[in-house]
């Protein structure tokens, strides 16, 4: 699919791996040859890390593309995509690099393949600086499926920092087109639930303490709902290494989902981990939006590809979201507007409507 190479500046805005994920996925979908320069220029260790490299190699394999300059530490790559193919694709970060970020880059592409796909993704399932796999399965999945597709996410093995070792298998069938979404009516919170986990050598008491601290924190602000956070000991044969963490989800009467999550670190007590997740959830409920701060940017590429006008109501628009919009406009020529919400109940809140006229991408194989 030769044509003029599109130049992408990897150092602007968010300046990290997300620019690489959005731009290479759109390149693959639209058949745009790409040069990305200044990769992760804004980070303490610039250039490609193992998880970015495995994501790039996966995209290359998804479409039999050509990839040059892709090695650890590289700050410039060129990518020339060909036709997207379904079937079985494997990516292994060989570290605790996030399998959820591998999903972010590959899922939009295989939706437009000729046949069903199976993505075998290896790395960290519950890793810092990335969505936890529980977030992907419990929040991202039900919301993104509103675009008119479904996928199956099978967690074979959980993996934690620093070794990774997790494995997730994602199965999905292609679609002809994506439908637009409208997520602007938040409704009221009807349920709060979650899981607090320990894996490996960590004692079960840590899970119970995280859950109890989170419940106490939420109760201060939301008194009329039962908060059901289950402490879980991950089975030995389903978790590699040691880890602990928590995810708490609030569900509303209109089917909106919000989350707060946190991972344990050496020397941080369990209560603090639980409270951090609870406070993140409460912050996401205060802004009046219909999606939380971590879902915003993950929906942008789907809004850009969909046929018709999508609208989502958000809290403050994150830098990740602004970055995703910038590249969706530059590469896919989708049209986005971001406006302060004019609803009376949002007047005192930092609430926005992100609207997109999608490009109506059509699967040429179906």
From Swiss-Prot:
Q: Write down the chemical reaction(s) this protein catalyses.
A: a 3'-end 3'-phospho-ribonucleotide-RNA + ATP = a 3'-end 2',3'-cyclophospho-ribonucleotide-RNA + AMP + diphosphate
The molecular function GO annotations come to: ATP binding; RNA-3'-phosphate cyclase activity
Give binding positions for ATP: 104, 131, 294, 297-298, 320
Where does it mainly reside?
nucleus
Xref: CDD domains: RNA_Cyclase_Class_II
Q: Which Pfam families match?
A: RTC, RTC_insert
Q: Where does this polypeptide localize?
A: Nucleus, Nucleoplasm
What are its GO cellular component terms?
nucleoplasm; nucleus
Supply the InterPro entries for this chain.
Answer: RNA3'-term_phos_cycl_insert, RNA3'_phos_cyclase_dom, RNA3'_phos_cyclase_dom_sf, RNA3'_term_phos_cyc, RNA3'_term_phos_cyc_type_1, RNA3'_term_phos_cycl-like_CS, RNA3'P_cycl/enolpyr_Trfase_a/b, RPTC_insert
**What is the E.C. number?**
6.5.1.4
Show the PROSITE patterns listed in the entry. RTC
Q: Which family does it belong to?
A: Belongs to the RNA 3'-terminal cyclase family. Type 1 subfamily.
Supply the NCBIfam families for this chain.
RNA_3prim_cycl
Q: What does this chain do? A: Catalyzes the conversion of 3'-phosphate to a 2',3'-cyclic phosphodiester at the end of RNA. The mechanism of action of the enzyme occurs in 3 steps: (A) adenylation of the enzyme by ATP; (B) transfer of adenylate to an RNA-N3'P to produce RNA-N3'PP5'A; (C) and attack of the adjacent 2'-hydroxyl on the 3'-phosphorus in the diester linkage to produce the cyclic end product. Likely functions in some aspects of cellular RNA processing. Function plays an important role in regulating axon regeneration by inhibiting central nervous system (CNS) axon regeneration following optic nerve injury.
Question: Which PANTHER family does the UniProt entry name for this protein?
Answer: RNA 3' TERMINAL PHOSPHATE CYCLASE, RNA 3'-TERMINAL PHOSPHATE CYCLASE
For this entry, the protein name equals: RNA 3'-terminal phosphate cyclase
């Amino acid at each position: 699919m030769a044509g003029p190479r599109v130049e992408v500046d990897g150092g602007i805005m968010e300046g990290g791996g997300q620019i690489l994920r959005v731009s290479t996925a759109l390149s693959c979908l639209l058949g745009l040859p790409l040069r990305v320069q200044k990769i992760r220029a804004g980070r303490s260790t610039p250039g490609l890390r193992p998880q970015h490299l495995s994501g790039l190699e996966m995209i290359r394999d998804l479409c039999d593309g050509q990839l040059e300059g892709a090695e650890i530490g590289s700050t410039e790559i060129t990518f020339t995509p060909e036709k997207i193919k379904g079937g079985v694709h494997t990516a292994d970060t060989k570290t605790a690099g996030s399998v959820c970020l591998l999903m972010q880059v590959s899922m939009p592409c295989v939706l437009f393949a000729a046949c069903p796909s199976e993505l075998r993704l290896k790395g960290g399932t519950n890793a810092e600086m990335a969505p936890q796999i529980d977030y992907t399965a419990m929040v991202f999945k039900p919301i993104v499926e509103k675009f008119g597709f479904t996928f199956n996410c099978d967690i074979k093995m959980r993996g934690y920092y620093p070794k990774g070792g997790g494995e997730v298998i994602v199965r999905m069938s292609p679609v002809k087109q994506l439908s637009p979404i409208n997520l602007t009516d938040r409704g009221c919170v009807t349920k709060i639930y979650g899981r607090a986990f320990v894996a490996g050598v960590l004692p079960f008491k840590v899970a119970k303490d995280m859950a109890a601290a989170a419940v106490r924190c939420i109760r201060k602000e939301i008194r009329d709902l039962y908060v059901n956070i289950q402490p879980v000991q991950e089975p030995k044969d389903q978790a590699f290494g040691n880890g602990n963490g928590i995810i708490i989800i609030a569900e509303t009467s209109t089917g909106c989902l919000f989350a707060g999550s946190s991972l344990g670190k050496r020397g941080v007590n369990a209560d603090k981990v639980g409270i951090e997740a609870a406070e993140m959830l409460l912050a996401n409920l205060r802004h009046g939006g219909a999606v939380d701060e971590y879902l915003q940017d993950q929906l942008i590429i789907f809004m850009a590809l969909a046929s018709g006008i999508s609208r989502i109501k958000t809290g403050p628009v994150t830098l990740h979201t602004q970055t995703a919009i910038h590249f969706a406009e530059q590469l896919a020529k989708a049209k986005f507007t971001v406006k302060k919400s004019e609803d009376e109940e949002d007047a005192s809140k930092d609430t926005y409507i992100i609207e997109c006229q999608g490009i109506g991408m059509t699967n040429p194989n179906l």
